[in-house]
Amino acid sequence: MKLNILRADPAGNITVFVLDPVERAQRAAIAARIMAIPSLKAEQVGYACPPEDDVDGHMEMMGGEFCGNATRAYGMYIASQRGGLSEVRLRVSGCDHVVTARVDLRAGTARAEMPCPRSVQRATAGGREGTLVDLGGIAHFVVENVEPSEEFFRAAEGVFSGLPNLDACGVIFLDAQERRMTPLVKVIETGSLVWEGSCGSGTVACAVAQSGHMTN
């Protein structure tokens, strides 16, 4: 199978978009093959879908999750294909409403709406307390001053078990003093576990955790 793809680098979160139609049942396997190509250095895969009449574009991630960086990047792609739109209306996976991406092709920038947390709560995993932020479809467990490791992710994975309808989950290792975060994200359908160069939803989760504002 030959597929047309587009490699995007939104803030280091390398995303490959498959531009040809792909059946949903095949997406996980194709994403795994794409992510296994060393030269692409892909952290995730998104799929272009035929857009409905009320939007400019439609994109679905490999596991049906929401991704802010991929949304921004796909918005920029659609803007370039549609004569330089400055506002792009997108339907994206993991979000129950149309998302607007604001694009400046000349400056090479794009912004996208991010979902508000569905719930925020304190949780403990591996003997460390953190903040569990459910953004609907994707949730993150934010911990401070914990050495980033897959072992800690495995220890923390149970904190997500009570959250419904998750497509993806991540542990965000936050160094508040250095203002640096290290995201480790799992897409449930594909089983992929990836150290991401950046993470839009993880950034939102960190901001919520640092704000100290608890919704429940």
Located regions from the model:
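Short, solvent-exposed secondary-structure boundary/capping segments
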Residues: 108-114
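Short "repeat-start/strand-capping" segments in structured domains, especially the N-termini
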Residues: 126-127
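A glycine-rich beta-to-alpha transition motif near the start of alpha/beta enzyme domains, typified by
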Residues: 1-108, 119, 131-134, 140-216
